[in-house]
Regions:
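Short, P/G- and charge-enriched loop/turn segments at secondary-structure junctions
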Residues: 35-41, 116-121
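Short secondary-structure boundary/capping segments
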Residues: 10-11, 42-43, 122-123
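GT-A fold catalytic core of metal-dependent nucleotide-sugar glycosyltransferases
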Residues: 1-29, 50-53
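A short, conserved beta-to-alpha structural element at the edge of catalytic cores
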Residues: 15-39, 146-152
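A glycosyltransferase accessory/donor-loop signature
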Residues: 47-175
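A short secondary-structure junction signal
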Residues: 3-8, 30-35, 61-66, 144
Length: 175
């Protein structure tokens, strides 16, 4: 869910990197270490939910053959296949961006709050975060969704439905 402008990400200088993405480090960054060992990498483990891509550079770098070879060679280690393959092949060509701004995992509100010593509260998130990522199995469009950010999703869904309804009425009036 996009709640603030993406332009600063769009205008980011990649400084020679091909991609920019956020790593969901959690409270202790333990997952990074586990993923580095599991995938034999030395960089942060990047989430593939939101990425900035230098398309010209990526077209020269990314090949289907490399992706299929990676899947074949690492099929036993792949837990989140898209992210795992991305990290194995292109993680070293990725610029880290702040997950709290560009790929906020809504399941981890408490962790963000603790990690920031209380700074990244709900008001801060609403003013500063650009992308809320509804990671995991449970989604805000499901009736039993219980996350704090679910109401925000429903609010934007309601606004969208109103706009679509108004547009439809205007189009019918013109005909």
């Amino acid at each position: 869910l996009i709640i603030n402008p993406l332009r600063p990400l769009w205008e980011l200088n990649l400084s020679g990197k091909v991609f920019a993405a956020a790593a969901h480090t959690g409270l202790t960054e333990m997952a990074n270490g586990i993923n580095q060992m599991r995938l034999d990498t030395e960089h942060e483990y990047f989430n593939s939910g939101v990425m900035l891509i230098d398309l010209n550079a990526a077209r020269n770098l990314v090949t289907a053959e490399d992706v299929f070879r990676c899947v074949s060679e690492h099929e036993r280690e792949l837990i989140l296949p898209d992210q795992d393959v991305f990290n194995i092949l292109y993680g070293s060509k990725t610029m880290p961006v702040e997950d709290v701004i560009w790929n906020y995992d809504v399941r981890n509100y408490s962790k963000y709050l603790i990690r920031s010593t209380g700074k990244h509260d709900l008001n801060w998130v609403m003013r500063n975060t650009a992308v809320l990522h509804f990671c995991g199995r449970n989604k805000p469009w499901q009736a039993d969704y219980k996350n704090l950010f679910g109401m925000l999703y429903l609010h934007y869904q309601n606004l969208t439905m109103r706009k679509l309804h108004e547009k439809s009425k205007q189009e019918r009036a013109v005909q």
